[in-house]
């Protein structure tokens, strides 16, 4: 091999080694060359012994000639020999060679090695390799499935052995059966009595103290309120069998008594409370001081007997009892008196009939007062149904008569009440007719009628024609399309850096549009933004034209109008913007600077600046379709759509377009 070929191999080796090391970092690779000095990255499968070329991703034939890079000696691959890092009996790291075909271990010198005390890196004895793998093991043992890898160390080495003839339940028990968890010894079971009452650790006040000490002002208010108002502690302590010994309810609520906690709710252990109760009760009666104190208490007993000597006092009480009975007998006597009372009551009612007549006179004296007359109208409506015969004049003032008729019909028989009522009714009727002064009602109606004509807008109608001639609308209004053609051409000259450009138009609106489009020819609009200006502008695909006379890329105007690129308010969301009939051109929801709905005026849906201003068209707009947000476009991946067009197909808002372009927020995500 010449030096030229050697240099060529070294150069190829540098490239291939870097590539293979990046693609296969965990594989031991041997580099060799074939008879034509072609470089190969060689790898031997430890299970099969096959040789692969990594750069070609192919298996090489077993007799393929391969040579070392720096010499002409052939490369010999030992058949299925695996190097292993093991630890001997002294825990020293040793590298051993395992031959799968012969199922033996060799040391680095090629000598057969006894691995009875050796273990591998996973602490598995190397003897297990000899027991589970190799041709001898497969020949001695007969299993339902052949050993994987033709004697390669089994992947299940070290796992529990499962009897293949056992039932599935037994196999599962052999595989996954674990020793039962160690039970707690008896010395850990607390058999002592519950401690005495301590208010610091009282179950009733503990939660309140924890709430006061750990109160978090930033926590949700309803969570804190829930812990306070809906707490079940009071109920559980009184009625929960797991919290207290409910056989002794008073003891559970006595602050000086012992109580059972949930740990001692067992009925067998609950009996342990009884001797604790007896212990404090014994010294109390044993106290000797109690006996002499009881002797004077017996002497004071006769003193108590002297107090009940008030026996004569109840005797007069018995005498007063008949005295009380006497007025009780008098009480039934007024019952006939009550019967007599309604009879005289009818007489003052008859006297009451002349009384309302002076009241009517009082009403007549203030004739000018409007509210009193209104009350008479209300009485007129109530009294009309009662008197059937008197149709014409009973209406103004029969108020006293019907009021009297209603109680009399209920209390007294109809025979006596009818003649009394008939006699007074004609008298007030005759007096009422002159008092009512029916012409009074007519002038009131006359007053309402003149009130209506001043409300009529006749003088306002006279004012309107006066305003109309003053308006200068016809002087500057654009004439209709039919009259535009004969008008003389309006011309305007715009001076740009490229020279003078003259535009001839016949329509004022077209002139304004072309003037606005020519305003974008200056360099400030077409040049690439400087680094410090790159983030002051929205991306080119996010621009929305706002006014005819406002240049789209006027840098001073954009710098001075930061409100156009601020985060939108609640009113400027797509839900609210649909009422304006305007659809945003390209809304990028990852870029809040593009949500400038306030600048969307006087333009229809999907108006893009590139189509409206053909002279101002940067290169980025050629991929506008890809950069534009497809949230509002329902025809995104339709095969019939044109991916190069800048405007999606027209959809009428009456055909459900708005509901699909601006869906309800609940359809965006369930968490909204």
UniProtKB/Swiss-Prot annotation:
Residues 312-428 are annotated as: 6 X 5 AA repeats of P-X-P-X-P. It comes from the Bacteria. Keywords: Cell membrane, Cell projection, Cytadherence, Membrane, Repeat, Virulence. Residues 98-251 are annotated as: 9 X 3 AA repeats OF Y-D-Q. Disulfide bonds: none annotated. One of its GO terms (biological process) is adhesion of symbiont to microvasculature. GO terms for cellular component: attachment organelle membrane; cell projection; plasma membrane. Residues 177-197 are annotated as: Disordered. Residues 310-339 are annotated as: 2 X 10 AA repeats of V-E-P-T-P-T-P-V-V-E. This is Cytadherence high molecular weight protein 3.
């Amino acid at each position: 091999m010449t030096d030229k070929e050697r240099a060529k191999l070294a150069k190829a080796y540098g490239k291939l080694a870097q590539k293979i090391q990046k693609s296969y970092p965990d594989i031991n690779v041997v580099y060799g060359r074939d008879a034509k000095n072609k470089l190969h990255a060689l790898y031997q499968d430890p299970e099969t012994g096959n040789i692969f070329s990594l750069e070609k991703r192919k298996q090489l034939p077993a007799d393929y000639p391969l040579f070392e890079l720096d010499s002409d000696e052939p490369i010999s691959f030992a058949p299925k020999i695996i190097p292993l890092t093991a630890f001997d009996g002294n825990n020293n790291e040793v590298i051993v060679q395992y031959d799968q075909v012969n199922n033996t271990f060799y040391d680095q010198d090629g000598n057969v090695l006894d691995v009875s005390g050796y273990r591998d890196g996973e602490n598995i004895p190397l003897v297990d390799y000899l027991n589970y793998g190799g041709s001898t093991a497969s020949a001695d043992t007969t299993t339902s499935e052949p050993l994987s890898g033709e004697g390669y160390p089994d992947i299940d080495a070290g796992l529990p052995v499962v009897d293949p003839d056992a039932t599935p339940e037994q196999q599962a028990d052999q595989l996954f059966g674990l020793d039962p968890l160690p039970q707690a010894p008896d010395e850990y079971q607390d058999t002592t009595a519950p401690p005495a009452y301590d208010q610091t650790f009282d179950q009733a006040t503990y939660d309140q103290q924890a709430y006061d000490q750990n109160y978090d002002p930033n926590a949700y208010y309803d969570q804190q309120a829930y812990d306070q108002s809906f707490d079940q502690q009071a109920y559980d302590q009184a009625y929960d069998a797991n919290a207290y010994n409910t056989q002794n309810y008073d003891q559970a609520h006595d602050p000086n008594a012992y109580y059972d906690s949930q740990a001692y709710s067992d009925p067998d252990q609950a009996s342990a409370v009884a001797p604790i109760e007896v212990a404090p009760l014994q010294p109390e009666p044993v106290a000797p001081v109690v006996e002499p104190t009881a002797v004077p208490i017996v002497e004071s007993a006769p003193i108590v007997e002297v107090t009940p000597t008030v026996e004569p006092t109840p005797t007069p009480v018995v005498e007063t009892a008949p005295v009380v009975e006497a007025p009780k007998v008098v009480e039934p006597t007024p019952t006939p008196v009550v019967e007599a009372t309604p009879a005289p009551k009818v007489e003052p009612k008859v006297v009451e009939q002349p009384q309302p007549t002076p009241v009517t006179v009082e009403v007549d004296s203030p004739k000018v007062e409007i509210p009193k007359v209104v009350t008479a109208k209300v009485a007129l409506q109530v009294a009309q149904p009662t008197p059937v015969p008197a149709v014409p004049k009973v209406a103004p003032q029969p108020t006293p008569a019907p009021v009297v008729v209603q109680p009399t019909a209920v209390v007294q028989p109809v025979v006596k009440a009818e003649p009394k009522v008939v006699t007074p009714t004609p008298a007030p009727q005759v007096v009422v007719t002159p008092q009512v002064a029916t012409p009074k009602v007519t002038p009131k109606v006359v007053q309402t009628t003149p009130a209506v004509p001043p409300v009529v807008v006749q003088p306002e109608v006279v004012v309107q024609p006066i305003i109309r001639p003053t308006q200068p609308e016809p002087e500057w209004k654009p004439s209709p399309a039919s009259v535009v053609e004969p008008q003389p051409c309006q011309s305007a000259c715009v001076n740009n850096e490229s020279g003078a450009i003259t535009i001839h138009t016949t329509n004022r609106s077209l002139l304004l549009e072309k003037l606005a489009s020519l305003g974008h020819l200056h360099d400030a609009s077409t040049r690439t933004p400087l680094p410090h200006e790159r983030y002051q502008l929205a991306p080119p695909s996010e621009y929305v034209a706002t006014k005819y006379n406002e240049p789209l890329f006027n840098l001073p105007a954009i710098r001075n109008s930061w409100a156009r690129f601020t985060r939108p308010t609640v009113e400027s969301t797509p839900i609210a913007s649909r009422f304006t009939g305007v659809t945003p051109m390209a809304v990028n929801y990852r870029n809040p600077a593009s949500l400038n709905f306030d600048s969307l005026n006087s333009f229809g849906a999907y108006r893009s600046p590139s189509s409206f201003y053909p002279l101002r068209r940067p290169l980025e707009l050629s991929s506008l379709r890809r950069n534009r947000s497809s949230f509002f476009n329902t025809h995104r991946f339709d095969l019939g759509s044109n991916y190069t067009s800048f405007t999606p197909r027209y959809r009428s808002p009456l055909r459900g377009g708005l509901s699909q372009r601006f869906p309800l927020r609940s359809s965006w995500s369930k968490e909204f």
